[in-house]
Amino acid sequence: METSSPRPPRPSSNPGLSLDARLGVDTRLWAKVLFTALYALIWALGAAGNALSAHVVLKARAGRAGRLRHHVLSLALAGLLLLLVGVPVELYSFVWFHYPWVFGDLGCRGYYFVHELCAYATVLSVAGLSAERCLAVCQPLRARSLLTPRRTRWLVALSWAASLGLALPMAVIMGQKHELETADGEPEPASRVCTVLVSRTALQVFIQVNVLVSFVLPLALTAFLNGVTVSHLLALCSQVPSTSTPGSSTPSRLELLSEEGLLSFIVWKKTFIQGGQVSLVRHKDVRRIRSLQRSVQVLRAIVVMYVICWLPYHARRLMYCYVPDDAWTDPLYNFYHYFYMVTNTLFYVSSAVTPLLYNAVSSSFRKLFLEAVSSLCGEHHPMKRLPPKPQSPTLMDTASGFGDPPETRT
């Protein structure tokens, strides 16, 4: 959010200095090469992963995809747009050539608008997915009637509409301007940068609201919902016997990992409270045990990933906004200069690793993803459909939408 120079400019009118020195810009060659390699890797992996995720969802549209497909498509499009627009512009104008800004005033405003739009769309989609998952796990009966694909589509559309509105101010406060003037008082063309156009006070208010709405509140909501989901999963497993009798209506602890098992547990619990008796036998399913363990780990990993990737980015924005002009010493400039590139790299990493989270959350999506990879790699295996009565999906598949029973799809 600063300038096309990756640190606050210190323009000097001394004509005896080089333009680098007058604008306060100096990026070492080793840093340019290093961050170019990192950006190229992130761009390649992230663009391929998000494009393939969107491909999987669209191909599976009439088959196995459930509610998760809308969230996956939303996140994939946001990540793909951010990487395709953000990384090339940043490499050219923020890493290699800090000035002059060559994309014009509209390009400056559009770049920051798209950047902010994708950030909002990502966090709102993650929060919406966490809310659906929490409801599906904690209130499965209600979730069956409420969490339809049609309503999920409206939820995703609403999140993008909100993102458009929240990102629009960025196109107003950013713009192109010249940092230096010639001896005749005319703007110096070579000093053209993409930077903030509003006062420091207005910028402080904007950044505070932006950090709160685009990071703190969505992350807090996601952490809370995922915490409730994890607690409910663990509580259910502690309440249910680990074994069940053949022919008995008593669900085993392992059977809770499917939606059918979760619903039967509710019926069984009511019967048991009214005096029903159960007898137990040994029952094992190692794969489902591991599925539950993985589901709990993934819920926690989602929050941790966004904290690691986004917290430094927003901390750096606050630093730019609140450090007074007279406090920018040379060591602080140098720190900010490279901190800028590190935080933006982490920000783009979050878009690149998002497809990995899809694969970790849903075993059904993972199978579709691997089939698509195999097909694109030349094995030409078609994306096969599962039979009408597949193996019971894991609870995380049910909660996220893949593996929905046919009657719940609309």
From Swiss-Prot:
It is found in: Cell membrane. GO terms for cellular component: plasma membrane. It holds the Pfam family 7tm_1. InterPro entries: GPCR_Rhodpsn, GPCR_Rhodpsn_7TM, NT2_rcpt, NT_rcpt. It is a multi-pass membrane protein. Residues 1-32, 88-109, 177-217, 319-337 are extracellular. Receptor for the tridecapeptide neurotensin. It is associated with G proteins that activate a phosphatidylinositol-calcium second messenger system. PANTHER family: G-PROTEIN COUPLED RECEPTOR, NEUROTENSIN RECEPTOR TYPE 2. The lineage of its organism: Eukaryota, Metazoa, Chordata, Craniata, Vertebrata. Residues 56-64, 132-154, 238-297, 359-410 are cytoplasmic. GO terms for biological process: cell surface receptor signaling pathway; neuropeptide signaling pathway; phospholipase C-activating G protein-coupled receptor signaling pathway; regulation of membrane potential; sensory perception. Expressed in prostate (at protein level). Disulfide bonds join 108-194. Keywords: Cell membrane, Disulfide bond, G-protein coupled receptor, Lipoprotein, Membrane, Palmitate, Receptor, Transducer, Transmembrane, Transmembrane helix. Belongs to the G-protein coupled receptor 1 family. Neurotensin receptor subfamily. NTSR2 sub-subfamily. The gene is NTSR2. Residues 381-410 are annotated as: Disordered. The chain crosses the membrane at residues 33-55, 65-87, 110-131, 155-176, 218-237, 298-318, 338-358. One of its GO terms (molecular function) is G protein-coupled receptor activity. A lipid is attached at residue 377 (S-palmitoyl cysteine). This is Neurotensin receptor type 2. SUPFAM superfamilies: Family A G protein-coupled receptor-like.
